[in-house]
UniProtKB/Swiss-Prot annotation:
The name this protein goes by in its record: Histone H2B type 1-A
Summary of the function given for this chain in its UniProt record: Variant histone specifically required to direct the transformation of dissociating nucleosomes to protamine in male germ cells. Entirely replaces classical histone H2B prior nucleosome to protamine transition and probably acts as a nucleosome dissociating factor that creates a more dynamic chromatin, facilitating the large-scale exchange of histones. Core component of nucleosome. Nucleosomes wrap and compact DNA into chromatin, limiting DNA accessibility to the cellular machineries which require DNA as a template.
Source organism phylogeny: Eukaryota, Metazoa, Chordata, Craniata, Vertebrata
Record-listed N6,N6-dimethyllysine modification sites: 59
Gene: H2bc1
Pfam families on file: Histone
């Protein structure tokens, strides 16, 4: 008696066996892992700069990664809004700086702005 395939067509037993073995061979191959982006290597580098003898647990790293992602999204969103308000199509360092000033409180904003300015200056001088 002919077998019914997954598509609903009838095929002979010999053809059915061939179809089954082909799908089994495909399953045997290793699938490429889906790459998950994170800031963990950069967080680790900063940790070693600040406290060279201190380690970090995977749970703490996960929390720090979520924190960095959240702050990045907030700054990007605010900078985008500022560019839209001023009828600009480009987010520049000025929009980022203003977004940081709006989002972060007092002294933290001042430090973030000074570090950002320093990083931009270093980048432009190396070009």
């Amino acid at each position: 008696m002919p077998e019914v395939s997954a598509k609903g067509t009838t095929i002979s037993k010999k053809g059915f066996k061939k179809a089954v073995t082909k799908t089994q061979k495909k399953e045997g191959r290793k699938r490429k892992r889906c790459r998950k982006e994170s800031y963990s290597i950069y967080i680790y580098k900063v940790l070693k700069q600040v406290h060279p003898d201190t380690g970090i647990s995977s749970k703490a790293m996960s929390i720090m990664n979520s924190f960095v992602t959240d702050i990045f999204e907030r700054i990007a969103g605010e900078a985008s809004r500022l560019a839209h308000y001023n009828k600009r199509s480009t987010i520049t360092s000025r929009e980022i700086q203003t977004a940081v000033r709006l989002l972060l409180p007092g002294e933290l904003a001042k430090h973030a702005v000074s570090e950002g300015t320093k990083a931009v200056t270093k980048y432009t001088s190396s070009k």
